[in-house]
Amino acid sequence: MPELVPPSTRVQRSFIDAMVEFLDEGRGGRNDDSMVARELREFGSVWDTPEGFAQYVERLQADAHESTLRASYLVPSTTYWWVEGPEYLGRISIRHRLTPRLLEIGGHIGYDVRPSARRRGHATAMLRAVLPYALE
């Protein structure tokens, strides 16, 4: 049964496979400003190494803190991964506050389900599982 977990190096191989799926569907291009695209551009070249992937996981965890340096258009957010055993299925992020743009497009919660796991209710299940954390 899938579960919501903090980002972890435990699912590195499956996570990388999911990112390849996103690339195959056209994500990550210059005009794509999604979280997946930003991370593909920033970390895609280092995910294959244990050190690079650990650095990426640490960055996701640091993004939850207001004191973390970030681009002016980004806000603090807490990210959880949706996994089933060693399989990465998707992610969901809670933005701690909103910019004027996020008020119009984006909102407080953003999510991605890997293409091969779509149409199975994962987005609904992730949202249901993350709502208690969003109330904190």
Task: Annotate each PLM feature.
Residues 110-113, 119-136:
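Conserved acetyl-CoA-binding loop-helix of GNAT-fold acetyltransferases
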Residues 1-108, 115, 133:
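GNAT-family acyltransferases
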